[in-house]
């Protein structure tokens, strides 16, 4: 009996590890649970990217369905996502606000002048503290809020046309239909 256990124990351990590996490989890396889903957006007041003497706050994003896109000029994926954000903004189906994250103001302003500006307004989060309040892991990330300012969706990584068509636009339409 002890002889069989000596061979059975490594087999059981191997099967357990193989099962854990299979489970880990089947997870979608874009799906990271956020404790903020279903909760009010964090309270914030930040200077505008375009004017350091003016501010934008969480109250500016309430009363309508909005998207908040966290981006930076140092973020390679943000550049790939930018064209898709411009297309989404042109549809007029959602107001997109930006949060420029841990960046240099002049670099970010130049970026928007050269590539186009899909945002209604841009908050400037130079030190990243507001991004931390939002649970940001890195850029880009996009949040969708309902009319009451409740976070309903978080997308990690660059948005694609497929993401917008299959995830965001149906969600936005559903949120717009709510009272």
Regions found by a protein language model. Name each.
Residues 3-7, 13-14, 79-80, 136, ...:
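Hydrophobic alpha-helical transmembrane segments of integral membrane proteins
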């Amino acid at each position: 009996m002890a002889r069989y256990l000596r061979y059975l124990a490594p087999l059981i351990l191997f099967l357990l590890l193989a099962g854990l590996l299979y489970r880990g490989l089947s997870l979608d890396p874009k799906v990271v649970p956020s404790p903020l889903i279903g909760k009010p957006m964090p309270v914030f007041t930040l200077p505008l990217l375009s004017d350091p003497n003016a501010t934008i706050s969480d109250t500016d994003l309430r009363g309508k369905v909005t998207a908040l896109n966290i981006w930076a000029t140092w973020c390679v994926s943000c550049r790939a996502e930018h064209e898709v954000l411009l297309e989404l903004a042109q549809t007029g189906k959602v107001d997109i606000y930006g949060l420029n994250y841990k960046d240099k103001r002049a670099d970010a302003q130049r970026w928007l002048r050269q590539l186009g500006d899909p945002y209604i307004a841009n908050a400037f989060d130079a030190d990243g503290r507001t991004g931390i309040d939002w649970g940001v892991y890195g850029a880009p990330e996009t949040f969708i809020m309902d009319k009451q300012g409740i976070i309903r969706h978080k997308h990690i990584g660059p948005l694609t046309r497929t993401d917008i068509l299959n995830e965001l636009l149906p969600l936005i339409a559903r949120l717009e239909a709510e009272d």
